[in-house]
Amino acid sequence: MQKSNSKFAVLPVMFGFFIMGFVDIVGVATSYVKADFAGMDDKVSGLISLSCFLWFLILSIPTGMLMNRIGRKKTVVVSFAITALAMLIPVLKYDFAFVLVAFAMLGIGNTMLQVALNPLVTNVVSAEKLTGTITLGQFIKAMSSFLGPILAAMFAGSVWGWKAIFPVYAAVTVLAMAWLAVSPIQEQLIEKSEITFARTFSLLRDKYIVLF
């Protein structure tokens, strides 16, 4: 941990794990969307999950390269901005095409967050506390994932409908983005050549990595 970082700098970073759990709303949202659009079969509704989770395969390496260029904190802030925008789309326009766009953007934001958040944790806690902090972060993420379907069900029984979860998630994400943006965090310098496509795919020559 950088000595100049305040002990309170860990708080907005840990809040990022709560935002990370928002992506799991895609499961319950698929059921609600299918009910909202009559005649939608399972194959079509399955596009919602695909549009969300496909991006981890596509963007993990580019996000690592972006993180090397602009820094870990800025990458997390960008991921929050994309997530917040994604959550606003169904509020502005609710049809199946816009739902797909919204969850695709949610997947993009979550991919960037997953790639950048753990490295950012290393800048705000000591090496001795790193494992415990990341474990706590995963617990926070699990709690967020657990609360999502409960909130959606609560809103579904209200005058606002289940879609009210989107502006709530957007507001919480904007709060997380603002909190992290104003929190001073000194990052460790990263070598520009640390993450590249060539170096990443060269790992496939390692038979142990291929097996796993």
Residue ranges of each PLM-predicted region?
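Juxtamembrane intracellular "pre-TM" segments in multi-pass secondary transporters
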Residues: 1-3, 188-212
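Extracytoplasmic
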Residues: 8-37, 118
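Residue-level signature of mid-helix packing/kink "hotspots" within the transmembrane helices
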Residues: 24, 52-61, 146
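Conserved MFS/SLC helix-loop-helix module at the cytosolic interface between two early adjacent transmembrane helices
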Residues: 58-97
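MFS 12-TM fold signature
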Residues: 82-87, 106, 172-176
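Short hydrophobic/alpha-helical segments at membrane-entry points of transmembrane helices
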Residues: 97-103, 211-212
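Cytoplasmic helix-loop-helix junction between adjacent transmembrane helices
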Residues: 102-139
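Helix-loop-helix hairpin linking two adjacent transmembrane segments in secondary transporters
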Residues: 136-184
